[in-house]
UniProtKB/Swiss-Prot annotation:
Family: Belongs to the universal ribosomal protein uL5 family.
Example GO BP: translation
GO MF annotation list: rRNA binding; structural constituent of ribosome; tRNA binding
Quaternary organization: Part of the 50S ribosomal subunit; part of the 5S rRNA/L5/L18/L25 subcomplex. Contacts the 5S rRNA and the P site tRNA. Forms a bridge to the 30S subunit in the 70S ribosome.
Protein name: Large ribosomal subunit protein uL5
Keyword terms of this UniProt record: Ribonucleoprotein, Ribosomal protein, RNA-binding, rRNA-binding, tRNA-binding
A cellular-component GO term for this protein: ribonucleoprotein complex
């Protein structure tokens, strides 16, 4: 819970000063973190779907729900309604534990890591992060996985603008890459 304490003690007051909010309820906060992982082209393999669910459970500490295909894709032998992967929404305590693990343990383990892209905001203060390898998380044992899969991390904030959201995420310790002009 170190990250939550940092947010409550330091980041909130810094954001209040930086953006001159009239009410403490206006200060942006992280509402939830959504993790999404698919089996990719192995969607026809039930074992691959099960592995995705198990890996998401290990990473998040919470049981994900199975995602299904919205449309049929002949090239992937995919039918509408077939299971594709898993998705989990983290809030409150689990969210802060995951963010702490992501920032302090997983991100430093990424090869040639120079920070996350500052362009991945959606215009409403939410941030999307793509992780190419699930093995950066300490819970995933390299010897036990069949295939390296990616993972989507969406950080949903109450910020109204990208600038506010970036200040919030930088405050809690997410390293953004330097943009060269």
């Amino acid at each position: 819970m170190i990250l939550k304490e940092k947010y409550l003690k330091e980041v909130k007051s810094n954001l209040q000063k930086q953006f001159n909010y009239s009410s403490s309820m206006e200060i942006p906060r992280i509402e939830k973190v959504i993790l999404n992982m698919t089996a990719g082209k192995e969607v026809t393999n039930a074992k691959a779907i099960e592995e995705v669910i198990n890996e998401l459970t290990l990473i998040s500490g919470q049981k994900p729900y199975q995602t299904v295909a919205k449309k049929s894709l002949a090239s992937w032998k995919l039918r509408e309604g077939m299971p594709m992967g898993g998705k989990v929404t983290l809030r409150s305590k689990n969210m802060w534990i995951f963010l702490n693990k992501l920032i302090n343990i997983a991100m430093p383990r990424i090869r040639d890591f120079r920070g996350v892209s500052p362009k991945a905001f959606d215009g409403r203060g939410n941030y999307s992060l793509g992780i190419k390898e699930q093995i950066i998380f300490p819970e995933i044992e390299f010897d036990k996985i069949r295939k390296i899969k990616g993972l989507d991390v969406i950080i949903v904030t109450s910020a109204k603008t990208n600038k506010e959201a970036r200040a919030l995420l930088e405050g809690i310790g997410i390293p953004f890459a330097k943009v060269e002009k």
